[in-house]
UniProtKB/Swiss-Prot annotation:
The keyword Transferase applies. The gene is fmt. Its EC number is 2.1.2.9. This is Methionyl-tRNA formyltransferase. Keywords: Protein biosynthesis, Transferase. Attaches a formyl group to the free amino group of methionyl-tRNA(fMet). The formyl group appears to play a dual role in the initiator identity of N-formylmethionyl-tRNA by promoting its recognition by IF2 and preventing the misappropriation of this tRNA by the elongation apparatus. GO terms for cellular component: cytosol.
C-alpha cells in the first residue's frame, strides 16, 4: 500500500509514525518551515521532524496544488490527511486509487474546522473523539467511515487531550484504512443540520475577561492551554490551571485573595482557585507560591 501523507502539527505525528511502520509512505507533504520562539528561528513543523527521523521523502509546497503532477506520477493507493492546514483541491483528492481520508479530532459533524479540541474544551464538553472521513471538496463535510468517542476528564487541557486523541486517532486511522481498502465499510453521509464549527483561536481570545463566568474562564484556560492570560498593569500573566470554588468569597472580578493556603480570583459569579500560574520571572509556580512572592505587586487583574 503506497500512501501519500499530508500533515503538519504534532497531532499528526502518531499517525505518521504508525502508518510508516505498517505501510509504504511514498511522500510526506507538510507546511513550510516557519519562524518560531523568541528568536524567530526558522523551525520545521513536527511532522517534518518525524519524517526526517524516519528517512521519508518530504515536500513542503507553499500551495499543495503545485504538487498535482508529482502526485499523478507517484500513483498512490491512498492519501491520508491529518492536521495539514491547507485546503486540498478535489482534483487531487481523487487521484489515489482509494481516494483520500482525513482524521479529524472531533465527533463529526460537531466541531468542524481548525480548532475542534480547543473549542470542545472551551465549551465545557464532557465527551469528544475522532472521526475518519472520506474527503470531499468542502472542509470536514465528507462521508464518515469510522468514529470513536472518549470522555473529557476534569484534568484535561488542550495539551493532554490533544495527545490522547492523536494516539487513539492513529490506531483508528490505521484500522479504517484496512477496512476501507478491503471494502468492509461503507461511507455514511453526515447530518449537516447538526453541524457546529470550531473557528481558529484568535489572539484576542487568549486574554481572560474576569467579568465572565467562572465556568467560561476555567474552560478557556483549559482550551487554549498554556496561553490564557490575565492583565495586571503592564504585565500579561499566564494562568495555567484553576478550579471552580462553590462558595462566595465576595471578590470583585479580577480581584486576588490569598487565605494562607490557596490563591483565589474573582469572576462574574463564583471565585476560581488558581492552582498553577506563571511567576513574574516566567517560571511555573503554584497559586500559593505566587501569592507569597508576588501578591504585593499583583493585586488585581483587569
Amino acid at each position: 500500500m503506497r500512501i501519500v501523507f499530508c500533515g503538519t502539527s504534532s497531532f499528526a505525528v502518531p499517525s505518521l509514525e504508525l502508518l510508516a511502520s505498517e505501510f509504504e509512505i511514498a511522500l510526506v507533504i507538510t507546511q513550510p518551515d516557519k519562524p518560531a520562539g523568541r528568536g524567530q528561528k526558522l523551525t520545521p513543523p513536527p511532522v517534518k521532524q518525524k519524517a526526517l527521523e524516519l528517512n521519508l521523502n518530504i515536500s513542503q509546497p507553499e500551495k499543495i496544488s503545485f504538487l498535482k503532477e508529482e502526485l499523478l506520477n507517484i500513483k498512490p493507493d491512498i492519501m491520508i490527511v491529518v492536521a495539514y492546514g491547507q485546503i486540498i483541491p478535489k482534483s487531487m483528492l481523487e487521484i489515489p486509487t482509494f481516494k483520500s481520508l482525513n482524521l479529524h479530532g472531533s465527533v463529526l459533524p460537531k466541531y468542524r474546522g481548525a480548532a475542534p479540541i480547543q473549542r470542545a474544551l472551551m465549551q465545557g464538553e464532557k465527551e469528544t473523539g475522532n472521526t475518519v472521513i472520506l474527503m470531499s471538496s468542502k472542509m470536514d463535510e465528507g462521508d464518515i467511515l469510522s468514529v470513536e468517542s472518549i470522555p473529557i476528564e476534569q484534568e484535561d487541557n488542550y495539551e493532554k487531550l490533544s495527545n490522547k486523541l492523536s494516539i487513539k486517532g492513529a490506531k483508528l486511522l490505521k484500522d479504517t484504512i484496512l477496512s476501507w481498502v478491503s471494502g468492509s465499510i461503507k461511507p455514511i453521509p453526515q447530518n449537516h443540520q447538526e453541524a457546529t464549527y470550531a473557528m481558529p483561536i484568535l489572539k484576542e481570545e487568549l486574554r481572560i475577561c474576569f467579568k465572565t463566568s467562572a465556568f467560561s474562564i476555567h474552560n478557556k484556560i483549559r482550551g487554549v492551554y498554556p496561553n490564557a492570560y490575565g492583565v495586571s498593569g503592564d504585565r500579561n500573566i499566564k494562568i495555567l490551571k484553576t478550579n471552580i470554588v462553590e462558595k462566595d468569597l465576595n471578590l470583585k472580578p479580577g480581584e486576588l485573595f490569598y487565605d494562607g493556603k490557596s490563591l483565589f480570583v474573582g469572576t462574574g459569579d463564583l471565585p476560581l482557585e488558581i492552582l498553577e500560574i506563571m511567576s513574574l520571572k516566567g517560571k511555573r509556580v503554584s497559586g500559593k507560591e505566587f501569592a507569597m512572592g508576588y501578591l504585593n505587586q499583583v493585586k488585581k487583574f483587569y
